[in-house]
Amino acid sequence: MWLKKAFEQAVDGGRILKSTFSDEAAIASFGVGKNMVASIRHWALACGVMRELEGEFRVGGLASEILRDGGLDPYAESASTAWLAHWQLAGRCFRSTTWYWLFNHVTAPTFTRQELEEPLARYARMLDPKHRLSASTISRDLETCLRSYAPRAAGGTPEDFAEPLLGELGLLQEVHKGQYAFRRGPKASLHDGVFTYALVDFWDQVAQGQSSLAFETVAYAEGSPGRVFKLDEESIAQRLIALSDFTRKKLEWTDSAGLRQVHRKPLS
């Protein structure tokens, strides 16, 4: 997959030279065209495979643990890798505004791409009033996003890195031609480790330093695991109850007098 191609460009210390994505000789090493190389760079940054630092790119620690030779998933074949990529795209608003907005702000039971275009344009203007996106850009981004989760019945374009990766997650379906709906409920392929990672990541973003987090926040807050993974209340509760054993009591669920919370001890 394309994320692996970006990772393979790393040299000593996890460094990736910026020229890797612009130099003609370097581009040849990817075996794809210039536009696709730009896409690889974009998605590698958006999915957290690498980050920009001091005039170069550096491979992220989690990406290295997953994609290195002998790593957790060196060929990016595991559903857990796909779930992590989804979390980076839809749980954070970094180079993935459309993904984040779709999973955190769209609440309609069904929707079409055309129905989403104007609300997304307003959201983008709110984030950056000085940067106006064309209608064609909004439409294209939405099409790419929707097709990465709900590929066409006849199969998608081979250039779209996300299509085979995220389509397996079962988060979005095309219920009628051009009409989509989220699939809410339990997600069998979502590993407890990925859910826990997302929970802690979300916690650090919205409530860093707090020792407890309300169930409603985990389930319904913007950027929460409940919203991003489209889990129902029962599924979230079951996962939170299992946290104590899974994390060796670093995270514990309590339900007392109707107050449902997750408690957190310092994580090493």
What is each PLM-predicted segment?
Residues 1-268:
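Donor-sugar nucleotide-binding helix/loop cap in glycosyltransferases
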